[in-house]
Structure formats: structure tokens, C-alpha cells
Amino acid sequence: MLEQSVLSRVQTNGATLIGVYKADGGIIGEVSYFLGHLIGVRECNLCDITHSPIKKKAKFKEFEKTLLEEHGIRVKLVHMNERTDAELAASEGREPCVLLQYPDGSISMFLDYVELKAASGSVSSFARLVESRLSIYF
């Protein structure tokens, strides 16, 4: 899925990609998002990339596994009401997005909502975005 030539050069030393959904977690948050999405008033491009209507996409699970096992990059997915203070400071008002947490704990924006929208719900397109961005950061 990810081009070996680029990521084989990436020295992450424990970096984490933190995906922030534009939805709250929990029963009320999930139902609210589902109903809003159904009638067209709620949108979360990261949700479309990571999940089918029922569960996490198999291709996304494979992508997570590849990042971790081959490149040492963890993926953490959080809802808006589940963010740490540092994650909130880096992403508030910019959801959905993907943050990059460096091994020293610092966090920066990695992919914004415009870039996530460009992936059009495709795990493969998202993987290409991540690959190209990692080659810049590391």
C-alpha cells in the first residue's frame, strides 16, 4: 500500500498519527452524527476514510498495521470529545484532521480537512497523502 522507497527512509522513532473525527464519541454522539449524515447536515471526511457505515474498513486496518509493523508509526483515532488537552489545542475548530505527535510529545497539524476531503473516502488516496507528507516531515 505504501511505497517502500519513501517510507524505508522514514525514521519515525515512535511517531503517532492522531486522526480527529468531526463527531463526538459515545452513543449520543454516534447517533447524532449518523442521523445528521443521513439527512446531509453532518460531514466527516475522516469517518468516510476509516469506516464503512457499520465498521472500520478492512483496508484501513491493513494500512494501520503496515504503518506500525513496517515503519513504527502508530495510528490513534479520537472523537472530538475524547481529545487530550494537547490534541484539542492543535486541532480545535479544524476537525476533521490528522495530527502528528512526535516522540517528544509535541503535536502539529499533519493533514487538514481539505486534504481529507480530497481523498474522497478512499483509503488508498489517504495512504498516498500520508506517504507524501511523511517524506516531508521525516
Give a label for each model feature.
Residues 107-138:
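Ser/Thr/Gly-rich flexible loops in soluble cytosolic domains mediating phosphotransfer, phosphorylation
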Residues 16, 93-95, 133:
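N-terminal/domain-start segments enriched in small and hydrophobic, helix-friendly residues
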Residues 33, 37-40, 65, 69, ...:
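Short, intrinsically disordered, mixed-charge
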Residues 2-5, 10-12, 28, 76, ...:
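N-terminal leader/targeting and pre-domain segments
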Residues 10-59:
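Local sequence-structure signature of Cys/Sec-based thiol-disulfide redox active-site neighborhoods
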Residues 80, 84, 91, 95-97:
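Globin-like tetrapyrrole-binding proteins
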Residues 48-77, 85-86:
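Short, intrinsically disordered low-complexity segments
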Residues 94-111:
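A short, hydrophobic beta-strand/beta-hairpin element that forms part of a small beta-sheet core
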